Amino acid sequence: MATKQLAKQLGLIRRSSKTSQTSSNVSRPKARQFFEYLIIIDFESTCWKDGKHSTQEIIEFPAVLLNVSNGEIESEFHTYVQPQEHPILSDFCTELTGINQQQVDDGVPLKICLSQFNSWIQKLQKEKGIAFVTAVPTHSTAEHKMCAFVTWSDWDLGVCLLYECRRKQMKKPDILNSWIDLRATYKLFYNRRPKGLNGALQDLGIEFSGREHSGLDDSRNTAKLASRMICDGCVMKITKSLDKVNHKISYTRPQQVLPAQDSNSVQVGTIQTSEMHSEKNPQPSFDKTAACVNVMNLQKDLEPSSLKINGKPIGRDKAVTMLNGHQGQESLPSQTLINGLSTTLGNGPKRCFTNRTSLGTLQTGVSLGAFTSTPAELPSLGSGHVLMSTTVTSVTDISALDISSTSDCLSMLADWEDAAVIEDSQEEPSVPTTEQSDLLMAQTSVDVTLPGTNMANCNRNQKYGSFHPHSIAYQSRNTTIYNINVKQNVSSCSTFKVPGVLARRSTNMMPTSAQLNKMSTSLPSFPKRKLSSVSFYSPPKKQPFIIHEDKCSSNNRSLPVISSRPHNVPPTVLNATVNNTFKSAQTGKITAPMCNCGRRAKRLTVSNAGPNQGKAFYTCSVKKRNEENKKGCDYFKWEQTVVKEKSAQSTIILSKSGISFSSNTSFTAANSASRRSFVSLRPSMRT
């Protein structure tokens, strides 16, 4: 034996490597794992044998850090928590968990416990460089090691801690919103249902160490089970997340014309659709769907038929349609070329995009947007977060339009904004009125520069839509009207007129000839439109209600109103608003009277054979069963008698107010001079 040991020390005899290989195979995971560290949590909460109390509180907060590569527990966190809602533990809870009342009394509240747990996590992040998968993007580098939380079921983080924080209005750490359910993973991997944590360990030949239902011991045994499953080839993945799923957001940008670099060429940019993925789960294929700009050079002397995009010829109409943002969707490369700057979108270097409007692009008659890319470090933005411009191809100022004085544009003016008018008697614009006024507009056309037109005719120095300062005829908060006679440097490019809209004309409210002669006087410096094409009254599209007016009372509209002769009111008005009591009496449906005992009488019908069969009567609703029952009364009345009484009462009320009824459902006001009725306002309502 001494010789053999000496030979081993001198290295003459090699040791057998079978044992070392077997032990290394057991400790090393077979499959490549995404998470290098796992934090196993197993809470213990208050409980009762009868189950009457449904709100459970955490009384033990354990957590252990497991190294996936070697299966060792490198750090532990453990504390007892004071219950606030039910501070006294039940005997069943003490017997089950082994936690006594003194331990929870010496513990800390849950809010302080979460703060201590957060400090422990931050310490691990600094020492071991771990990182968690959260919805909030973090600047993770290659040195960071991914970590996830593991529980035996969803109860710990999905029920117990979640609802307790909601009840107590406490902020839960965001890193606890996602975890791995080891019980569900065990069931899927081994294809069998485990019988508790102890049963799952026994199935794999692992002995449970410690005390069951002890939070720290359960966490350690769960870590053993997770390490064994990883060695068997199970890949740990997130099974539950409380974070809201951020769906893909598609941003569609219209085709835009970028400012021309010289007078012989113009760059036409086509911004495509990009999909912004959720930053919680970054996709490696994000660069495939990034936004891009395809830059083309259109020569000066080319014909419209020779225009090409990506090597494909296009026509004049298609080129104009692409400029308007309706066509031209092409492929989506992974880079963007904007104003000569190559910018990588997605997971590349961060660029800060700002939106601006180029004045040189006003030659096209539309508002165009351009990007300016400047490198900027944005710590609040994660990987794949890109700020996109939201400039829409639209006309934002009425100064860039010419609106004609024909009747086709009247309906368009009503849809744009409130019509602005200028009085003829004034030399300068003032407050607009609706009478003796005229509206100064130019022709409704939008000048759009074609890519194939001669760009030399459209000088860059001539900005379309720029007017002389003295050319403003009227200006308000929402409207600016220019004098077209003073307008200078009008572009000679091709124009596209807006399709005309036929306005609905009204002939019943046309002004008289005297009013037309009076309004024919025009301002000396501003052109006027023809009054024959103007409709001063636009009837509503739909009548909201019908007004019934008495012809004989239309002449007298002053207060007080004196009724000198009877007025006949239509039956519709009478039936709708006047004398509901009389109407109910005529139809036979009246309100049941009150009986002697203060209750509402009940309407019954005679069913026995005889002369009164079928007649209705009212009696007390409480039936008198015997002589001892004294709750009811002996009230009885025929319905005809009740109707007559109701009619007599309504007649007395109307006679006191000076109105009498006749058989033809018309009422008459008393014409006595001493009983005139005046309609006037109360002193508090007078102005």
Curated annotation (Swiss-Prot):
Keywords: Exonuclease, Hydrolase, Magnesium, Metal-binding, Nuclease, Zinc, Zinc-finger. Its cofactor is Mg(2+). GO terms for molecular function: 3'-5'-RNA exonuclease activity; nucleic acid binding; zinc ion binding. PROSITE patterns: ZF_GRF (PS51999). Zn(2+) binds at C595, C597, C620, C633. Mg(2+) 1 binds at D42, E44, D218. Residues 38-226 form the Exonuclease domain. The active site is at E44 (proton acceptor), H213 (proton acceptor). Binds 2 magnesium ions per subunit. The keyword Magnesium applies. The keyword rRNA processing does not apply. A zinc finger (GRF-type) spans 595-642. Its EC number is 3.1.-.-. This is ERI1 exoribonuclease 2. It comes from Xenopus laevis (African clawed frog).
